[in-house]
Design a protein with these regions (language model features):
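Juxtamembrane helix-break-helix junctions at the cytosolic face
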Residues: 57-78
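Membrane-helix boundary connector in multi-pass membrane proteins
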Residues: 89-106, 122, 128
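Membrane-helix exit/interface motif
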Residues: 21-28, 58-65, 89-97
Length: 128
């Protein structure tokens, strides 16, 4: 599960960094999604904050449990992976409904949706 540790660190630290730079407003305008300053779209984006922070918290907690050889790490990792998948899926569904196919927003969300699938299957197989 060494590779899962790498994915969790990239994803969880990445989410925390994304929200910090979003909060302080240093994302260059060229990287902002279409209609970023529309209050409804801004609210939609901020609605992901609690979900993304839960992903980071559960992922990092899972790594802590794993390092202590605590068997609960698998359950916490599964929670983090399912939340990560949901986060990517929700964003891609939104962009699809809007017919907005900006690769700079699609790639990160495809990553969030696809990488967890492998580990979800792996963890479920280990439990049975």
């Amino acid at each position: 599960m060494k590779s899962l540790r790498i994915f969790f660190l990239i994803t969880d630290i990445g989410f925390i960094l994304y929200w910090v730079i979003t909060l302080i407003g240093v994302i260059p305008a060229s990287y902002l999604f279409k209609d970023y300053h529309n209050p409804i779209l801004s609210a939609w984006n901020w609605s992901f904050l609690p979900l993304d922070l839960m992903i980071s918290f559960s992922g990092l907690w899972s790594l802590r449990l794993m390092s202590k050889e605590d068997a609960r790490w698998k359950n916490v990792a599964l929670i983090s992976l399912v939340l990560t998948f949901a986060s990517g899926l929700m964003a891609l569904a939104f962009w699809s409904i809007r017919r907005d196919f900006d690769i700079s927003w699609w790639l990160p969300n495809l990553y969030l949706m696809l990488y967890p699938v492998y580990y979800i299957v792996l963890l479920i197989k280990q439990k049975t």
